[in-house]
Design a protein with these regions (language model features):
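Flexible "arm" and connector segments at domain edges
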Residues: 1-61, 65-101
Length: 101
């Protein structure tokens, strides 16, 4: 994967948005909705005892990622910075014998 792939993706996500077209509130609510669709997809597979539809799950996770990228942009945060921060946090947690997440 390219070093700045997440930054490039973040910029790509912004290309389809008109200036002033969406607000942080719209992005946050969209993230909640799409996260719910991810959960619903998993719930239905468990409830109906069938494999998760991976193509549908990829689609919904892509929608989640789109909203995360736009929330990051709306708040002035680069996705690569989020990744680095999270890797550092998890590395520290695991090295201290921390939790599972």
């Amino acid at each position: 994967m390219k070093k700045n792939a997440f930054t490039d993706y973040q910029k790509f996500c912004l290309e389809g948005i008109k200036p002033g077209g969406h607000s942080l509130t719209v992005f946050a609510l969209g993230l909640g909705g799409e996260s719910g669709e991810v959960l619903d997809s998993i719930k239905k597979a468990i409830r109906d005892k069938h494999p998760i539809d991976l193509e549908h799950l990829k689609e919904e996770l892509g929608d989640v990622l789109w909203y995360v990228a736009n929330i990051a942009s709306a708040t002035g945060i680069d996705l690569n910075d989020i990744l680095k921060f999270n890797i550092d946090k998890l590395t520290k947690r695991y090295s201290l014998g921390g939790g599972n997440n």
